[in-house]
């Protein structure tokens, strides 16, 4: 299905150089805040984790969440717990997955964070994702029972490019490594595909919304998108016209509808 967006309105008093990077729900019970952390990711590859309690009280004009370099910006903010993994994806198709618990909790909000991924020249992070970890390993090997358990809770990492191509790949193919490395190929960044605009975890039964720079929005069922390995280009998901480009893609959250 498809629709166009023509009107917009302000929900926050933003300055001309500011824009919203993330919107997310908070736990309803404030006593639950201590059980969660909040992780920030910047375009230049920095990450920082704070206790969610650090942001329990925010006034109407907002508060400074993270100190940034002049050429940097926040591209993703997620709530996470120690039993989860972090995935950073870049516009050139690279990605890295590391354990959330191995990222230390920062005190205060004045730090620039630490390196999440080593970026190639002119590359930048476009997506921050959080997924449950696969803690079933024993002595570094996976038994048949381990593999069955992981397969039962399998998710897919969906990647979408600016030229309307994309694919989904099993999260099992994204190995856990140490933070700060160069990462692995998540999707091939080819002239046909263009740069990657979005990458995030989905289940087979989910649906996504894809938006273009011409104000067009299309709704797609994840099951209609081909499953492929990491080192592939994917297939056409949305047909674009002229100078039209995909600018974002998000998973539809049924709990918010």
Task: Label each region the model flagged.
Residues 1-5:
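Short, small-residue-biased leader/transition segments that mark boundaries at the very start
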Residues 6-42, 125:
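Conserved catalytic alpha/beta cores of large enzymes that bind or transform nucleotide phosphates
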Residues 9-17, 59-63, 104-112, 177-182, ...:
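Short, surface-exposed linear segments at secondary-structure transitions and domain or protein termini
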Residues 10-24, 56-82, 119, 184-190:
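Beta-propeller and closely related beta-pinwheel folds
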Residues 14-22, 83, 111-112, 118-128, ...:
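Repeat-based blade/solenoid architectures
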Residues 25-33, 78-80, 147-151:
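A short acidic-Thr-Gly-centered motif at the start of a beta-strand
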Residues 37-55, 66, 77-80, 85-106, ...:
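A structural feature that tracks compact, well-ordered secondary-structure segments
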Residues 124-149, 171-201, 250-257:
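Intrinsic, low-complexity N-terminal interaction/targeting segments
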